[in-house]
C-alpha cells in the first residue's frame, strides 16, 4: 500500500497483510431513523448519515485491498449480567438506560433489531463481528488476541460516535502498541463541535496522541 506519516518524525507502512479496518458500532440504535437515539432521544442523524456514506466507501476500498474488516457492536445480554454498576448508573443518569424499551427493541440488547448493524453495511463471512460491552473494543473481548494471531499491528478506525467508542478504542490501540489511523470524515457524532473536539485532541501535541486522515488522503 503506502507509507503514511504518523507524527513529525515517525512513519509506518500500511500493508494489507498486517492491517485491519475497524468499523465501530454502526448499529440501528445509533444510526437508524427509527433507532433509539434518533426516535426516542430526538438526536439528529445528519452527521451520522454523512459519515455513513464515507464509511461504506472505506469498507469497499478495504475489501478491494484485501484488508481484514472488523465490525463491532456495543451490546449486552438480555439479563444484563454483563453490565457493570458504573455503566448502568452513567447511562441511567443520562436518561438512556441500557435495556430501555425502544422502537426497535430494548436499547443495546443482543437479539433486538436496534442492536444489529445497519442494512447498508453487510458483513461478509470472512469479516469479524465483535460484540463488546464497554466503550473500548479491547475491554472484555478477545480482540487483542485475535489481532496477534492474525499478525495485525496496523488499524484503520472509523465509526460512531467519535468522542465515545471511537476515541476510546483508538487511544487504547495506541497504548497497546498498535500503529493506528483514525479516518476523521468516516467518524460520526450527533454534534459537530463534539466531533471536531475529539479530532482536535488526537491531532494535538505533534502526533503524540495519534494521527487522523480524511478518506481522500488515505485512498490517494
Predicted regions, residues:
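Active-site-adjacent betaalpha module
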Residues: 1-22, 29-30, 57, 61-65, ...
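A short alpha/beta connector and helix-capping loop motif
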Residues: 17-19, 34-62, 66-68
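Short loop/turn segments at strand-loop or loop-helix junctions that form parts
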Residues: 24-28, 73-74
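Short connector loops/turns at beta-strand edges and beta->alpha or beta->beta junctions
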Residues: 26-31, 36
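Short beta-strand segments at enzyme active-site cores
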Residues: 67-74, 183
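Short catalytic/ligand-binding loop motif for oxyanion handling, primarily in non-cytosolic enzymes
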Residues: 77-81
